[in-house]
Amino acid sequence: MELFDLTGEVAVVIGATGVLGGAVAQGLAMAGAKVAVLGRNADRGHSRVKLIKGNGGTAAFFPADAQQRTGLATAHKAVSESLGEPTILVNAAGGNDLKVTVTPERPLQQIALEDWKENFDLNLVGGVLLPCQEFGPAMTQRGRGSIINIASVSAHIPLSRVVTYSAAKAAVLNLTQFLAREWAPKGVRVNSITPGFFPAEQNRKLLFNDDGSPTARTKSILGHTPMGRFGEAEELVGAAIFLASAKASSFVTGADIRVDGGFLSQTI
């Protein structure tokens, strides 16, 4: 449908080497966008590109560490020369770290400050700030663009144990709204997507035991999710295409779309 056709758009997906970012990258490509897969893991990046091309899409891998501005600048230049100037930016890098996960044996006061800063910067500075600083100005100069930041249900209600991740993702929502306000007059829309619980590398140890059985945390999560299941990575694609499309979401900025199976709607 033309409303969701991204033909002619160039999308940069940072963190496309991961499960969620990879699914979004593939979805944008299937909607017609040329996709730049950015990430640190070259093997995963090339695998994602191969998958996209195998399904008829256009994509290329560009190595980049989202926490290094110079590396992002190098990748930006390469993307522009290879695919064209980006009109869509998806910030999907980030994740929790067991070093900053609160446990009975490691309460909050025992988390090392350097570990806190490392994970906080991964999710906020590298997760949103630096990519927006690098790719945003070119969009504002051209007078068009869409930026999509991946948040988390823990940004709305801090979940137990993942304190640093929750704080950083809450900041992601705040920064998203700030940028939406600042860049709206210049034609750039900035929104976020809040995924619920999607099994991926960074949360697998919290959700499953070594033998593959669900942890007590998983049972609690599913009991609190009205749909009673985890999300599938492909279920983020619809929201991403909607926000990426200048036709479908032309008057949408500063918004957060929850793809959480009703998790944040549940009380008792």
Give the ranges of each region predicted by the language model.
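Conserved glycine-rich cofactor-binding loop
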Residues: T17-G18, N41
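Alpha-helical segment proximal to the catalytic Tyr-Lys
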Residues: P137, R181-P185, S250
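A glycine/serine/threonine-rich, flexible loop-to-helix segment
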Residues: E2, T103-R106, P185, F197-H224, ...
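Residue(s) in the substrate-gating loop at a strand-loop-helix junction
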Residues: S152
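Active-site helix of classical SDR
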Residues: C132, A168, T176
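C-terminal helical subdomain
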Residues: N123, G127-L130, P185, S192, ...
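Substrate-binding pocket helix/loop in short-chain dehydrogenase/reductase
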Residues: V100-F120, I221
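Short C-terminal tail/terminal secondary-structure segment
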Residues: M1-E2, I157, M227, I241, ...
